[in-house]
Curated annotation (Swiss-Prot):
Enzymatic class: transferase
Matches recorded under Pfam families: OTCace, OTCace_N
Enzyme Commission code: 2.1.3.2
One GO molecular-function entry: amino acid binding
Protein name from the UniProt record: Aspartate carbamoyltransferase catalytic subunit
Organism of derivation: Methylococcus capsulatus (strain ATCC 33009 / NCIMB 11132 / Bath)
Single biological process term from Gene Ontology: amino acid metabolic process
Species classification: Bacteria, Pseudomonadati, Pseudomonadota, Gammaproteobacteria, Methylococcales
PROSITE patterns recorded: CARBAMOYLTRANSFERASE
Cysteines engaged in disulfide bonds, as pairs: none
Length: 328
């Protein structure tokens, strides 16, 4: 789907959010509005009573055709903290395991008068496909589709960066690891460039970079020490071994020797660098435990921020607009 078509299906005629499928094609103003709304919800999640009534009476269906811990759980928590009713469909025991098509599954759930689908699927474009076929009152959020996009992960990451750094101007960001198979990397590149960082670097072996990667608006590096030099933010990615064969890297041990983040290598970055990882972490393969658990790591803050960001996106999509007053 083209950028224009993707943007058109995501937004109402007045330019407000209806679906959240990809960051590609969305404006800086809209991404900023999502973060500003998430900032309001961040205070709610720290209260004793962590609920607001914005989505009371609404029903959210989590449709995860791929395994997930953080994403599914934070979407569920986000919906419940907005007072929505949540259905988690067990794909292994659902009618899809008996051969029911994706569209038939959606139509049957639609007949139960649900209001939102949160979809994770191994097939790129699955969330777009669903969004094109649902009733006008239903919103679709993409929780990851194939290699294509993971927009809420990218939004919680840029929200974490904004909170740590105060903004995006002048920042140099290095994304390190399996860029080729990563939907997170693509969404983060779109978000970071839209928000105006100074430079986005991608650091990986040649076998784990897409062809013509420069067209995405990034600077490629094949040497980690050089790629980390003077950066403000490091985003580590896991090797997606389930999506690759043996030809991509010689071995996990050799990969760590060349591209694993260690304290020594991190010295090349700026003194106030922050280290991020969307999870799950493979310690000793892409990152050393001393870094993952160290003072520069904001990995657990990313998880916390994921709830507020997903609350923001759900509220904006359900209300067909970002102008919300968050009760506190």
């Amino acid at each position: 789907m083209s950028v224009t078509a993707a943007a058109d299906i995501q937004l109402t005629a007045s330019g407000r959010l209806r679906h959240f499928l990809t960051i590609e094609g969305l404006s800086r103003e809209l991404l900023t509005r999502i973060m500003d709304t998430a900032e309001s919800f961040a205070g709610v999640t720290a209260q004793n009573v962590k609920k607001v009534p914005l989505l009371r009476g609404k029903t959210v269906v989590n449709l995860f055709f791929e395994n997930s811990t953080r994403t599914r759980t934070t979407f569920e928590l986000a919906a419940k903290r907005l007072s929505a009713d949540v259905l988690n469909i067990n794909i292994a025991t659902s009618a899809t395991s008996k051969g029911e098509s994706l569209l038939d599954t959606i139509r049957n759930l639609e007949a139960m008068h649900v209001d939102m689908f949160v979809v994770r699927h191994a097939q790129s474009g699955a969330a777009h496909f669903i969004a094109r076929h649902v009733a006008p009152h239903i919103s679709v959020l993409n929780a990851g589709d194939g290699r294509h996009a993971h927009p809420t992960q990218a939004m919680l990451d840029v929200f974490t960066i904004r909170r740590a750094k105060g903004g995006f101007a002048g920042l140099k960001v290095a994304i390190v690891g399996d860029i080729l198979h990563s939907r997170v990397a693509r969404s983060e590149i779109w978000a970071l460039n839209t928000l105006g960082v100074d430079e986005v670097r991608v650091v990986a072996p040649k076998t784990l970079l897409p062809a013509h990667v420069e067209a995405l608006g990034v600077v490629p590096y094949h040497d980690l020490n050089e790629g980390l030099r003077d950066v403000d933010v490091v985003i580590m990615l896991r090797l997606q071994l389930e999506r690759m064969g043996s030809a991509f890297i010689p071995s996990e041990h050799e990969y760590f020797q060349r591209f694993g983040l260690t304290e020594k290598r991190l010295e090349k970055a700026r003194p106030d660098v922050i280290v991020m990882h969307p999870g799950p972490i493979n310690r000793g393969i892409e990152i050393d435990s001393a870094i993952a658990d160290g003072p520069r790591s904001v990995i657990l803050q990313q998880v916390t921020h994921g709830i507020a960001v997903r609350m923001a996106v759900m509220s904006m999509a359900m209300h067909a607009g970002p102008d919300l007053e968050v009760p506190v």
